Structure formats: structure tokens, C-alpha cells
Amino acid sequence: LGMEASIISSIGNDSSGELLIKQIKKFEINTTNIQKHPSLKTGEVKIVINENGIATYQILSPVAWDEISITKSGFNEVKKSSAFVYGSLSSRNEHSKKTLLELLKNAKFKIFDLNLRPPHYSIDTIKLLTKNADLLKCNQEELLFLSKIYGYKKNDLKQIMIFLSEKTNTSTICVSRGENGAILYQNGDFFEHSGYKINVKDTVGAGDSFLAALIYFQMQNFSLEKSLKLACAMGALVSKFDGANPKISTNSLISLAK
């Protein structure tokens, strides 16, 4: 979509790391703050796609991104950025968790993309990262998990979102609902989109693309309703193709979102 982006992470001193950097640069993403670990290998995830196009993940450990260090360059990158997106997976190791918490202190707008990948999380860490967020993005299962760990008994989606917003002081919560679209809550108001009917080929990357589009259009001062509609369109388009990063044209996005 054209927004300038930068990644803070760590790769191994290996061929996989070199290949990853080349691939990231193809998308014109700043790799300055991707560190090279002297001993741990580049992260690897084994993905299995079922007959419905739904993915399951086996995330190897330990890997280079378990030991992301704080650097002056990374610190400054976060400080100057309009938004800082972080996930829960990177906090499975204390080294990277400590770095993340330091970076969050200087972020202007903090976006938490919750990804529960057992056994790579702890409840205390999830609570800590949620309370740091200005915007929380999760799916329905993850929302129910959050309501459970905070002791909320009801199953109504909207009531859970209101409760969590008040409990964690998170002003905006966005819940993706797969083929049924998404719902967003901000300061007492709800925005919903029912999604787009498409032939799903591969869901890997759809959630990330959805969030990226939501952030982009919000940064372009689109209304929340319009931003959510376009984000759902982006997630749907990505699901039509194999792989997490298919090339999606602006025209195809706008055409689907009409």
C-alpha cells in the first residue's frame, strides 16, 4: 500500500537468514534493525494446511528472534514511527521480552497483535502486553481466552470487548471473525463488517494483511467503518492465493470493497 515500514528482529548467521533479508528487501521494507545472532539459527515455522485452507503452526525454539537486543537504532526507529506493531510470540523468551517492553515505553501508538501459539506464552505476559496496547487485534478464540483469564463469565462478543477495553484501558479492540468479517470497538462505538464470500485457498497471512490494511487506512484518516471494510477486503483477497504475501493491486482491493 506504500507505507514505509521497518522490522525489528534477529536472524541467524546462516543461509536462511540471508534469503529472508533478500525477500524482505523485495518488498522495500527497512532491514536496518534486523540483527544477526552469532549462534542461534534463523527462525523456522512448519505450516500444515488442512482441506479447508486453515493453517496450523509448529514454531521451532530456540531461534535468533528469541534474543533480540535493544539498540539505539531500534530505539530511535520506534520513537519516530507513527505506529508500533508487536506480537505475543516474540515474548516467549525473557531476552526479547525485556527488549520489547523497553521499546514500548517510547512508542506513539501501540498495536498488539495477539497470537496464541501454545506453548509459547504465559498468562502474565499476555496481560502485561495487553495493558500496554492502544489497539488490540485478536480473533474470536483469542478474545474468549482473554475474557477467561480476566474472570469474565459471559460469552457475548460485544460485552466481552467492552469489558476488556475497560479492564485493560485499551481504547480500541478489533476482532477478526474469519469468513464472517470483523468487528471493531472504540470508545463506546461498534463497527462491523460481515466479510466477503470468496474461494479460500490459503489463510496464511490473511490476518496480518487485514491488520496492515486497517493500520494503513487509519493512518490515512479514513473513517473506522471504511478502514474496517477495506481491511476485510484485503484479508479476503490474500486468502484467494497460495502464500502469505501475494501481490494485491489497489484496484482489486477497491473493486472488492465497493
Predicted regions and their residues:
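Substrate-binding N-lobe of the ribokinase-like
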Residues: 1-45, 49-54, 62-64, 256-258
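Hydrophobic pocket-lining residues within nucleotide cofactor-binding pockets
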Residues: 11, 89, 198
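Alpha-helix N-cap/helix-start capping motif
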Residues: 14, 40, 140-141, 208
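A general structural signal for well-ordered alpha-helical segments in protein cores
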Residues: 17, 43, 100, 143, ...
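Ribokinase/PfkB-type carbohydrate-kinase core domain
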Residues: 23-36, 51-191, 222, 253
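Beta-strand scaffold of nucleotide-dependent catalytic cores
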Residues: 46, 57-60, 193-194, 214
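Conserved phosphate-binding/catalytic region of the ribokinase-like
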Residues: 154-258
